[in-house]
Design a protein with these regions (language model features):
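Juxtamembrane transmembrane-helix boundary motif
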Residues: 1-12, 33, 63-148, 205-288
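Transmembrane alpha-helix interface/packing and boundary motifs in multi-pass membrane proteins
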Residues: 9-20, 146-156
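Alpha-helical transmembrane segments of multipass membrane proteins
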Residues: 13-14, 30, 34, 58-59, ...
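Juxtamembrane transmembrane-helix termini in multi-pass membrane transport proteins
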Residues: 18-72
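Interfacial segments of multi-pass membrane proteins
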Residues: 27-41, 162-177
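Transmembrane helix-bundle signature of multi-pass membrane transporters/permeases
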Residues: 43-51, 76, 80, 182-187, ...
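Membrane-interface helix-cap regions at the ends of transmembrane helices
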Residues: 53-65, 117, 188-204
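Internal active-site segments that recognize and position negatively charged phosphoryl groups
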Residues: 139-161, 165, 169
Length: 288
């Protein structure tokens, strides 16, 4: 089943490279439902795999100038220590609180995604001018990191989706810069959690090796596409992935089917929209 790992890795890699999110929400269910992994091993394998391939995506976005590195670092100051606190509390409380927190996070993603889509169509896009962090912005970044890190540690979800949602609501960043910053922060946070899972024996290194063969080129391709795709189309994709991630996390009936159909329709619409935009540009710039 090695080629299936490669295909799954590539598809998730492209999505994460373009939107910065959806990796864990998709890969963990794939490992459990398609490949028959034990849930604990699926989570550990997904986290360490995400740390590796998201690092490649973050480096590519950094080269493309679509990363606000200082914002990511300030969020890490809060997220790394609080994620460890969340893991410790989750271990002591059991599964009841985990399920409640997971539903809260999923519901927030659905509402945030819908709100973001509405805002995208009712208003213009964010300015691409440099955004300088003020003291207040740094405090907010640490707070976002602390809250998000705690939730990730407690529920094992939202390393990309939660922080992407928080940044789009708080900071005047373009969609592609949110994607790049989100990837850098998520990669660093996942390395911490992934190392812990590796030490506890919750990682299938054979599966990770084959997943990376697909996910690394996938995330590099997706990162490149994020600067080629028109801003509004990328923002729509961003919002759709937020909503679908929330549906999957909440556990809506037939969630997996809804997510697969939604991603397929969204991908087709994105390809058609982008092709039309590129064609119209060529027509506009061609000599009369």
């Amino acid at each position: 089943m090695t080629w299936q790992f490669v295909v799954a890795g590539f598809g998730v890699g492209v999505l994460v490279g373009m939107t910065g999110m959806g990796g864990g929400s998709l890969m963990t269910p794939i490992l459990i439902l398609v490949f028959g992994f034990d849930a604990k091993v699926a989570v550990g394998t997904d986290i360490l795999h995400g740390a590796v391939f998201k690092s490649f995506g973050a480096m590519r976005h950094r080269m493309l100038g679509t990363v606000h590195a200082r914002l990511a670092l300030w969020m890490l100051l809060g997220s790394v220590p609080l994620s460890l606190v969340g893991v410790q509390i989750a271990s002591s409380l059991g599964d009841g609180t985990d399920g409640t927190m997971t539903r809260i996070v999923g519901s927030a993603l659905i509402l945030g995604g819908v709100g973001f889509l509405v805002k995208t169509f009712l208003t213009g896009h964010a300015d691409d001018a440099p955004f300088l962090l003020k003291p207040r912005d740094r405090v907010v970044a640490v707070a976002i990191g602390a809250i998000g890190g705690f939730v990730v540690g407690l529920t094992s979800v939202g390393s990309g989706t939660f922080f992407g949602l928080a940044m789009l609501l708080v900071y005047p960043l373009t969609a592609r810069k949110i994607v790049g910053t989100d990837l850098l922060h998520a990669a660093a946070l996942l390395w911490v959690a992934g190392a812990s899972h590796l030490l506890h024996g919750n990682v299938d290194l054979h599966a990770i090796a084959w997943l990376l063969i697909g996910s690394i080129p996938g995330v590099l391709l997706g990162s490149q596409m994020s600067i080629k795709v028109p801003e509004r189309a990328l923002r729509v994709a961003f919002g759709v992935v937020l909503v679908l991630s929330g549906i999957k996390i909440v556990g809506v009936p037939q969630a997996s089917l809804i997510v697969v159909i939604g991603l397929a329709v969204g991908a087709l619409a994105l390809v058609v929209y982008t092709a039309r935009q590129l064609l119209s540009r060529e027509v506009a710039t061609s000599p009369k």
